[in-house]
Amino acid sequence: MSVYNPNDADFAFTIGIEEEYQIVDPETRELRSYITQILEPGRTILREQIKPEMHQSIVEVGTRPCRTISEARAEIVRLRGAIAGLAARHNLRIVAAGTHPFSSWMQQEITPDERYRMVVGEMQEAALQLLIFGMHCHIGMPNNEVAIELMNVARYICPHLLALSTSSPFWMGRNTGFKSYRSVIFSTFPRTGIPPTFHSASEFERYVQLLINTGCIDNGKKIWWDLRPHPFFGTLEFRVCDIATKVEECLALAATMQALIVKFYTMFEENTTFRVYRRALINENKWRAQRWGLDGKLIDFGKRKEVEAKALVHEIVELVDDVVDMLGSRKEVEYLLTIVDQGTSADRQLRVFAETNDLKAVVDSLMNETIEGVPVMTFDTESSVQTAHS
């Protein structure tokens, strides 16, 4: 059982989290295209852990590979605190939400980089309006064959994770009626959504090579599925989620992804398995998740009936119950039940708007929740850390 123990040298199922934050002006509450001013001092402090994105109003961070969710907690808190502090030097704030409630993509500046120029050249307006913010979670894999086997099974759970993460109900000043409008916007890109199944790692590699040979992509990173084997990191990357507004929500999702992967792997080792369903069926659940979040019903394809999404979250917590203590993630996984009780970020945003009829109040709430429990770093003029405060 050493392969399942985070304290063992052979442990493979590490966690890596990437988050994409909004850079926001606290006076106007609009997005600000300010990544260049944040990036230079940010690289001094965070080195490769801070990156630009296509729009200059986005800043991306990534944790180091973590064996436990406790390590990931320390990383996420440190990274959010550092980025919040770097933004504060310019009287700016950060927000973790899948879309900005009212800022327009037409007012955003594109990062001057050849890679982004090529994306815009190919994707045109679909790229320009891709003003969305996600959370990606990498789970380490023992080898490529295991990655494909686990992807085939874990596809089924992607809509459930999306429902738990929803944080993008507004788009360009409108209530979209969706809990995750980010997912709708991203669907305009090719090679997105629920992945197909593959019989082996070699079949997947032949598929990628075919796309490269026919000029569709230059490498596997341009396969943007909700769940994919990362072409360079040796991980299975969950990409389905809106960015979680609160740190606790982020950690609950990441811990659940790790626990599910470990659970599925133990089932393989015990010669039991989880049924693999068609992409067309899983897509039905994904549409429901992005539309209604936890307030809707998802389809239990094994039982061939609709089930309240909230009830299915309880089933997920029960499914991984026998692995969470070994992984040290019981508290974080059980926080899913708090999300069920209190709602997602999308639910809270909609409540604030219902109470105030003011999208600026929604941004204020998001700014506060993004750094809830996070010590914000302060920096001197040379960008070295001075202090941190909550």
From Swiss-Prot:
Enzyme class, broadest EC rank: ligase
Gene Ontology MF annotations: ATP binding; glutamate-cysteine ligase activity
Superkingdom as given in the UniProt entry: Bacteria
Keyword annotations: ATP-binding, Ligase, Nucleotide-binding
Keyword Transmembrane helix: no
GO biological process, one term: modified amino acid biosynthetic process
Catalytic activity: L-cysteine + L-glutamate + ATP = gamma-L-glutamyl-L-cysteine + ADP + phosphate + H(+)
Pfam families: GCS2 (PF04107)
EC number: 6.3.2.2
UniProt-listed InterPro entries: GCL_type2/YbdK_subfam, GCS2, Gln_synth/guanido_kin_cat_dom, YbdK
Family per record: Belongs to the glutamate--cysteine ligase type 2 family. YbdK subfamily.
UniProt function note: ATP-dependent carboxylate-amine ligase which exhibits weak glutamate--cysteine ligase activity.
Official protein name in the record: Putative glutamate--cysteine ligase 2
Source taxonomy: Bacteria, Bacillati, Chloroflexota, Chloroflexia, Chloroflexales
